């Protein structure tokens, strides 16, 4: 259902409703108003009521969490909007900042700091003036229309987040179809063959893919297409010390090996030769 308006509470602003409004703005491109909702607003499915109203009713586009019991799992307005858009599970998996944001909004800074295993002052040191300014300006606004600078910033934030989630999901599905896992002695190697066309960043998403299949620690090295050449890139995974690619820097078909040994590029396209180079780089 199309929206005509996004409504959230007035006063101080937090990341959860700002991001929730940003997502809805990116999808529906409608004004954002900051005021208390009326019963008519809550009953109107063309008005999204975010982080206020005491009701979670996605069928009417009402996304509040404050009525949930104190022992409810940490869920904020952003969580509810992500669920509504069908991307919550991917967001929890791919956005490392989301779960802390849910905790911060529902449990407060002290409990969140304890949950993260840091002190409150450490969290304060991570504050950014970008966050402060955008939240402050959003809190001062009463009505934002498409085309206005702050509305467009929110739209960019929401659009970029949705694009990131959808493109990463597509990329991971592609890697899952193409990747091979080789077993070498007591560890594994991920090999990603060349395709036509190549993705813009052939190595993008590999770390996330390995985490999703439970091989983040067992894979020691990666082999993937070199987007600047006809061969492959070879790199350590998680800086695993089993491989030092400076050991192959004198090979005639290796045109780059980083001085720190964590990555190399070869023009070799034949898999047997790539495996040979990998063996030569073994410490």
Give residue spans per PLM region:
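Short, surface-exposed loop/strand segments
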Residues: 1-62, 69-70
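Glutamate identity and glutamate-enriched acidic tracts
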Residues: 36, 40, 55, 89, ...
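Short alpha-helical "patches" and their helix-cap loops
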Residues: 32-41, 91-104, 116-118, 152, ...
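Generic marker of "main functional regions" within proteins
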Residues: 25-29, 34, 59, 72-73, ...
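A basic- and aromatic-enriched beta-loop-alpha substructure that forms the phosphate/nucleotide-
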Residues: 47-133
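C-terminal accessory domains and tails appended to enzymatic cores
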Residues: 3-4, 11, 15-22, 43-46, ...
């Amino acid at each position: 259902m199309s929206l005509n308006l996004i409504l959230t509470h007035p006063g101080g602003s937090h990341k959860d409703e700002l991001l929730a409004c940003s997502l809805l703005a990116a999808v529906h491109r409608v004004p954002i108003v900051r005021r208390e909702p009326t019963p008519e607003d809550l009953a109107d499915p063309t008005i999204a009521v975010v982080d206020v109203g005491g009701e979670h009713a996605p069928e009417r586009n009402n996304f509040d969490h404050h009525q949930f019991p104190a022992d409810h799992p940490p869920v904020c307005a952003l969580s509810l909007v992500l669920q509504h858009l069908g991307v919550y599970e991917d967001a929890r998996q791919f956005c490392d900042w989301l779960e802390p944001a849910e905790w911060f909004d529902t449990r407060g800074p002290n409990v969140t700091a304890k949950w993260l295993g840091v002190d409150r002052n450490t969290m304060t040191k991570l504050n950014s003036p970008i966050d402060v300014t955008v939240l402050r300006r959003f809190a001062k606004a009463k009505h934002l229309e498409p085309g206005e600078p702050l509305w467009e910033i929110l739209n960019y934030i929401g659009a970029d987040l949705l694009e990131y989630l959808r493109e990463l999901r597509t990329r991971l599905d592609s890697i899952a179809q193409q990747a091979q896992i080789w077993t070498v002695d007591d560890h594994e190697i991920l090999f990603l063959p060349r395709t036509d066309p190549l993705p813009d960043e052939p190595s993008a998403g590999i770390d996330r893919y390995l985490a999703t299949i439970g091989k983040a620690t067992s894979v020691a090295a990666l082999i993937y297409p070199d987007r600047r050449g006809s061969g492959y890139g070879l790199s350590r995974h998680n800086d695993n010390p089993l491989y030092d690619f400076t050991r192959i820097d004198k090979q005639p078909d290796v045109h780059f090996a980083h001085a720190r040994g964590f990555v190399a590029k070869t023009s070799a396209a034949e898999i047997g030769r790539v495996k040979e180079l990998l063996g030569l780089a073994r410490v």
